[in-house]
A protein has these predicted regions:
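Conserved acetyl-CoA-binding loop-helix of GNAT-fold acetyltransferases
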Residues: 42-52, 241-257, 279
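Active-site rim helix/loop that mediates acceptor-substrate recognition in acyltransferases
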Residues: 1-10, 174-194
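Conserved beta-strand in the GNAT
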Residues: 21-25, 196, 202-212
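A short, internal acetyl-CoA/4′-phosphopantetheine-binding micro-motif in the GNAT/acyltransferase core
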Residues: 33-43, 230-245
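Conserved beta-strand-loop-alpha-helix junction that forms the acyl-donor binding cleft
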Residues: 64-72, 267-278, 292-296
Length: 315
């Protein structure tokens, strides 16, 4: 659950958690001043700012006057992160507030792959457990991503992979043993790892996160060293609506951009006949780059850019 629950009311924005309206002063420069409402629950301030920026998309920044907020530990922590008492939307959403643990960091060394003749940064170790958690006020659900576990996820994953809708695009139906072995292989790969997406801690989707340079897509475009890519499927029928797709697609892109601050672009390469997915990609910040052929499918390459995502798309 959210620590704030900011909603629209007849008199402006209201916090259900505090059971009072927010004292917001609206400026002429697409900014606002949020006056301190008093004693706050743990985690309230960041949740409130996140939801204010969504409830009032015209806002470019929210000021938290230091003289009012200087006794509030949550505000002081935030001031230290942004080096100001003015919280800009684009900078705020790039803080690692929604990472479940600090992102892994690589050594900084470079690696040469002689077989593929590519030279790229050494990648960090695969993360463990949950990697991202954020309350999405648009759908009033908690979105989270965690590393897939062959022990607890194999039966569910097998059911998803044998769904005709999924099998049509993934071409990977098979027994429980086959799917368990597949998940285990994904957990030992050097350039990719598997995630399970959850709404309110209920699994609904499967994603594979990879470094584009080392993936098959790297042969088909001019990659940058920290480009990230993803494969995806939604396994549970109840979570297939457009509003849910926008939630997890933006959330997953957000995670990739937070996990590695040097990542400027995220890419996908869905089959060209996956028309339903393409309808959702542009609103989430993805634009078509080109179409090309893999040995097993014709694909469309789509890409999201960090600057465009945080300035024009958002969460």
């Amino acid at each position: 659950m959210s620590e704030a629950n900011i909603i629209h009311s007849r008199y402006g924005l209201r916090c259900e958690k505090l059971d009072k309206p927010l004292n917001l002063g609206w400026g002429l420069d697409n900014s606002a001043v949020l006056h301190c409402p008093g004693e706050l629950p743990t985690g309230w301030l960041c949740d409130a700012l996140d939801q204010i920026f969504i409830a009032a998309p015209q806002l470019s920044a929210v000021a938290l006057p230091w003289a009012e907020w200087r006794e509030e530990p949550q505000a002081l922590t935030l001031f230290g992160q942004v080096k100001s008492d003015i919280i800009h939307r684009t900078a705020f959403w790039q803080l690692p507030l929604w990472l479940s643990s600090p992102a892994n960091r690589a050594s900084g060394e470079m690696v040469f792959d002689a077989e593929r003749e590519i030279y790229f940064p050494q990648r960090p170790p695969r993360p463990l457990g949950e990697v991202y958690r954020r309350y999405d006020p648009r759908i009033r659900r908690m979105l989270s991503f965690r590393i897939a576990d062959p022990v607890s996820d194999a039966e569910r994953f097998t059911r998803w992979m044998n769904d005709p809708r999924v099998e049509y695009f993934w071409e990977q139906s098979g027994s429980l043993e086959v799917q368990t072995a597949y998940l285990e292989r994904q957990l030992t790969g050097k350039h990719a790892f598997p995630l399970i997406g959850c709404f309110d801690d209920r699994p609904f989707s499967y994603f594979e996160i990879y470094w584009a340079a080392e993936d098959r897509i790297g042969r088909h475009y001019s990659w940058q060293p920290f480009d990230r890519g993803l494969h995806l499927l939604v396994g549970e029928q109840q979570w297939r609506g457009a509003h849910y797709v926008q939630s997890w697609l933006r959330g997953l892109t957000h995670y990739l951009l937070l996990d590695e601050p040097r990542t400027q672009r995220t890419v996908l390469e869905p089959r060209t006949d996956n028309l339903r997915l393409f309808r959702h990609l542009e609103p989430a910040g993805y634009r078509t780059i080109k179409e090309f052929d893999f040995p097993h499918k014709r694909s469309r390459m789509v890409m999201a850019d960090r600057h465009h995502f945080f300035t024009e798309v958002g969460l």
